[in-house]
Amino acid sequence: MFKNTFQSGFLSILYSIGSKPLQIWDKKVRNGHIKRITDNDIQSLVLEIEGTNVSTTYITCPADPKKTLGIKLPFLVMIIKNLKKYFTFEVQVLDDKNVRRRFRASNYQSTTRVKPFICTMPMRLDDGWNQIQFNLSDFTRRAYDPCKLSYPKGLLLRQTLLRG
């Protein structure tokens, strides 16, 4: 999707106050909802993703699972509000050996586990709004050896940015 796009600075893939914030995202909703609301704390439009289980209500990008984002920027930045419920996000990267690796961070896990194709890790959210900066290059290097990145899937949101 962004493979032939000049990538420098920030590349926004989700912006809740845009006219179509989920245009390139697929939505899965079962026993929950995905809707745009005005947040009382910041008095701005936000995307609320809420469900009874993190595996039944979520968004994924790109919408077509056969496509890839083709983004080479090393950082994933998200602004997330702590709703005091289970939260997780997942991102998949393609390393320099052409191996897809997934990283999953969640606020309900207590230990880090590194397996050949997935690394799961705990994440703590402060009360209110949190800025999550995920250094994909560093996490990939520390978990799987030195790698260069291009990532195809995954993510969760007021604003989601990728930056170099």
Curated annotation (Swiss-Prot):
It is found in: Nucleus; Cytoplasm, Cytoskeleton, Microtubule organizing center, Centrosome, Centriole; Cytoplasm, Cytoskeleton, Cilium basal body; Cytoplasm, Cytoskeleton, Cilium axoneme. One of its GO terms (cellular component) is axonemal microtubule. Keywords: Cell projection, Cilium, Cytoplasm, Cytoskeleton, Flagellum, Microtubule, Nucleus. InterPro entries: CFA20/CFAP20DC, CFA20_dom. Pfam families: CFA20_dom. GO terms for biological process: cilium assembly; flagellated sperm motility; positive regulation of cell motility; positive regulation of feeding behavior; protein polyglutamylation; regulation of cilium beat frequency involved in ciliary motility. Its main location: nucleus. Belongs to the CFAP20 family. Cilium- and flagellum-specific protein that plays a role in axonemal structure organization and motility. Microtubule inner protein (MIP) part of the dynein-decorated doublet microtubules (DMTs) in cilia axoneme, which is required for motile cilia beating. Involved in the regulation of the size and morphology of cilia. Required for axonemal microtubules polyglutamylation. Microtubule inner protein component of sperm flagellar doublet microtubules. This is Cilia- and flagella-associated protein 20. The gene is Cfap20.
